[in-house]
């Protein structure tokens, strides 16, 4: 779930503040519900710039649900596909400098393992709502073979069967 992009920091201050308040509300409110429904929650992106209270809620949510084995919810927070690729490149560069890997070991598989998503499966389906017809810097590496579903509706108005009909 693409919850907050790296580009969102460039919105007007009042919008960013409103988004932070929404995060505080939903991260805290949904914590027990997601755990009770056996949902495992993880995050991708760089959460360091977020306020301390939001980082605490994120940590609580991921820690509480870490052993859940039901649905998997990955929250993209302060995430951008290009920034993720840069982070992966830096991780590999550091491993090369520290002689943990050799240049011969750098390939698509080792690169993918250094992305924020690591060993997570790539998405089979990406749903884009509200009339947008672009990926908007989301999972650029991982979406290479994903099905794309575009809807003019907002996410809250999409019936769960719509993407299922598309892919079946």
Question: Where are the regions a protein language model picked out?
Answer:
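Short beta-strand segments
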Residues: 2-4, 78, 128
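Short, charge-patterned binding micro-sites
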Residues: 2-20, 24, 30-55, 60-64
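Conserved nucleotide-binding/hydrolysis micro-motifs of P-loop NTPases
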Residues: 5-9, 47-50, 80-83, 132, ...
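Elongated, mostly alpha-helical coiled-coil "stalk/stator" tethers of large membrane protein machines
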Residues: 35, 46-114
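Short glycine-/polar-rich loops that comprise or flank the Walker A/P-loop
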Residues: 37-39, 69-71, 144-146
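Phosphate-binding beta-loop-alpha motif at adenosine-nucleotide cofactor sites
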Residues: 74-77, 150-154
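Active-site oxyanion/phosphate-handling segment shared across diverse enzymes
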Residues: 86, 93-97, 103-151
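Single conserved hydrophobic/aromatic residue that forms the stacking wall/gate
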Residues: 158-168
């Amino acid at each position: 779930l693409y919850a907050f992009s790296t580009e969102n920091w460039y919105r007007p201050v009042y919008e960013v503040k409103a988004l932070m308040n929404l995060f505080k509300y939903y991260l805290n409110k949904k914590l027990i519900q997601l755990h009770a429904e056996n949902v495992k929650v993880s995050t991708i992106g760089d959460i360091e710039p977020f306020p301390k209270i939001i980082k605490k809620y994120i940590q609580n949510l991921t820690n509480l649900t870490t052993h859940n084995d039901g649905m998997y919810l990955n929250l993209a927070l302060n995430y951008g596909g290009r920034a993720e690729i840069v982070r992966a490149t830096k991780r590999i560069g550091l491993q090369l400098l520290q002689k943990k890997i050799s240049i011969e070991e750098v390939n698509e598989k080792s690169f993918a393992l250094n992305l924020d998503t690591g060993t997570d499966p790539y998405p089979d389906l990406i749903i884009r709502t509200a009339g947008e017809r672009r990926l908007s810097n989301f999972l650029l590496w991982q979406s290479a073979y994903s099905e794309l579903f575009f809807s003019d509706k907002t996410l809250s108005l999409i019936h769960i069967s719509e993407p299922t009909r598309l892919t079946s």
